[in-house]
Amino acid sequence: MADGATIVGRVRKTPSVARRGSLRRWLRRKSNVGFLMCLPLIVLIAALVIYPTVYAIYLSMLNKNMTQFVGLSNYAFLLKRNTFQLVFFQSCFFAVSAVILKATLGFILAHLLHNISGGNQRIVRGMLLTPWVIPLALSTLGWQWLFDPSYSAFNWVLNAFGFASVPWLGERWIARLCVIGVNVWYGTPFFMIMYLAALKSVPEQLYEAATIDGANAMQKLFFVTLPMMRNIISITVLFSLIVTFADFDIVRILTAGGPQDMTHIFATYAFEVGILSGDIPLGASVSLFILPILSICAYFVLRGVTRRSKEIAA
């Protein structure tokens, strides 16, 4: 009888022991432990992102007085509106051109810095990072003074050499280029520091092997450097595209969407329609147009990164 009771007890204890053993094995994996440590932050970020998004979708389906459900009428109204079509074009033009310029200039600066050794690199790197560490609103105010038609420093220099003053923020294409230029000035250091870190991680043996094979500088760039940096380039471009599409400070401070709505982007137009004009549902509809654009971009970029990571692992 005693032996029978012992066997029964062991049988009863077996499932719990097995569960504890599987839990220990699960916790031994570093990735699982890391996930558990990040879980509180993930939950917090999800709450801060999901709730505003769902609430914005709800608001976008109400009428101006927020008393009646109108479905997708606000979106249909925006798509037929010439001003919004212009905003859509300007947002895409602003984001794509600014990101391309930032990525290109950041890559060039990273290469130049990579060839500087010792303490000089730290000094130059710190100087080039200055635009990125200054608060954006403050630095944009400085640019506004430089572009001001009454006391523009740029126009003073042009006048000193006998050229006429330029309406930097008064002509639509010049204003667009000025807005893009300020965004590029602010965001290029981010690309520079990311690409510099990526360049330092490229093994020197690859360059030595390419030299032995007779490769010149351009061949090393296209067949060694760029393939090794593809993932970091993709991630930085995606991140910058998201931030640039959502940019507000630069356009709002420099032009407030003018002249004649010619520099409005999604964020500033949503602010004008939703806050200044008092049509919050329509403003929410404007802001939500960014979501599908960025979702499509993120899908293709992350799919490419995942595919390349699997190829490297294989």
Please provide the spans of the model-predicted regions.
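Short, Lys/Arg-rich, polar N-terminal cytosolic tail immediately upstream
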Residues: 1-29
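A structural signal for multi-pass alpha-helical bundles of membrane permease subunits
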Residues: 30-314
